[in-house]
C-alpha cells in the first residue's frame, strides 16, 4: 500500500504533545486492549505523517479508506474482522462519519461501534480515525468511551519556539521562526514563497 505524508524522518519535536515521545505512545496503544484512536485537528498539522509512522514502525498492513460507498458495504467490515492480512482499519477525513448520532445524519457510527466491539475479542487489530474536527463534542460520545478509545489526540500548529526545535531536529536551513506566532508542520517544510502542497490521502476510494 502506498502511504503519503511528509517525506521526512519523523522526530519527536514534530509532535511535542506526546510527553513520552511518539514511539512510546504507539507502543502503549498497541499494547492496550482499547482499539480506537482518534487524531483530530486542522489540516497540515501532521496527522497523515503520524499515521505513516505508525504503519511503518509497527509493520502494519492497513485497510485505509475515506470513501462512504466503501464504508457502507458491510462486507468491507466483515473482511476486516475475519481476515488475517490486515491489522488496522484507518478512516481518513472522517468528519461526517464521527458526528453524534443524535444529530440525525450519521448512520455510519453504529457500524463503527459494532466493529469496535468485535475487535475487543481480537488482539492486535486497531481502528484509527483522522478528522479536521476541532472539538470532541462533535464526535459521538460512545466512540470515545474509555475502554473502547485509547486516546483522542489533538494535532495543532507549533509555536515559534517549537517550530525552531522541530526545524533543528530535521536539519532544516535556519529561518526566523519568530516571524509568525504559529507554524503548521506543512509550512515548516515549505520553502519561502512556495505554495503549500496539496494534500494527498493515504487510502483508496473512487
What are the language-model segments listed below?
Residues 117-143, 150-152:
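Canonical AAA+ ATPase core
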Residues 3-32:
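N-terminal pre-Walker A segment at the start of P-loop NTPase domains
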Residues 74-123:
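Conserved nucleotide-sensing/catalytic segment adjacent to the nucleotide-binding pocket
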Residues 49-53, 57:
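Active-site signature of alpha/beta-hydrolase-fold catalytic machinery across serine-
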Residues 32-50:
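Walker A/P-loop nucleotide-binding motif
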Residues 142, 148-206:
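C-terminal alpha-helical "lid" subdomain
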Residues 64-71, 96:
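A short hydrophobic beta-strand->loop->alpha-helix junction that borders the nucleotide-binding pocket
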Residues 56-66:
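Post-Walker A helix-loop "phosphate-sensing" segment adjacent to the P-loop in P-loop NTPases
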Amino acid at each position: 500500500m502506498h502511504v503519503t505524508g511528509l517525506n521526512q524522518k519523523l522526530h519527536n519535536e514534530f509532535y511535542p504533545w506526546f510527553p513520552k515521545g511518539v514511539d512510546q505512545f504507539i507502543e502503549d496503544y498497541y499494547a492496550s486492549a482499547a482499539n480506537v484512536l482518534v487524531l483530530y485537528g486542522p489540516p497540515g498539522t501532521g496527522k497523515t505523517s503520524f499515521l505513516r509512522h505508525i504503519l511503518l514502525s509497527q509493520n502494519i498492513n492497513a485497510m485505509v479508506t475515506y470513501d462512504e460507498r466503501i464504508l457502507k458495504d458491510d462486507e468491507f467490515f466483515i473482511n476486516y474482522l475475519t481476515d488475517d492480512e490486515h491489522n488496522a482499519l484507518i478512516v481518513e477525513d472522517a468528519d461526517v462519519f464521527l458526528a453524534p448520532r443524535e444529530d440525525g445524519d450519521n448512520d455510519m457510527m453504529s457500524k463503527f461501534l459494532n466493529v469496535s466491539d468485535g475487535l475487543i475479542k481480537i488482539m492486535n487489530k486497531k481502528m484509527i480515525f483522522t478528522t479536521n474536527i476541532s472539538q470532541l463534542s462533535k464526535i459521538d460520545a460512545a466512540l470515545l468511551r474509555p475502554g473502547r478509545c485509547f486516546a483522542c489526540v489533538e494535532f495543532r500548529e507549533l509555536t515559534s519556539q517549537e517550530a525552531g526545535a522541530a526545524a533543528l531536529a530535521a536539519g532544516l536551513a535556519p529561518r526566523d521562526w519568530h516571524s509568525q506566532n504559529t507554524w503548521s508542520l506543512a509550512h515548516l517544510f515549505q520553502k519561502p514563497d512556495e505554495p503549500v502542497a496539496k494534500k494527498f490521502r493515504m487510502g483508496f476510494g473512487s
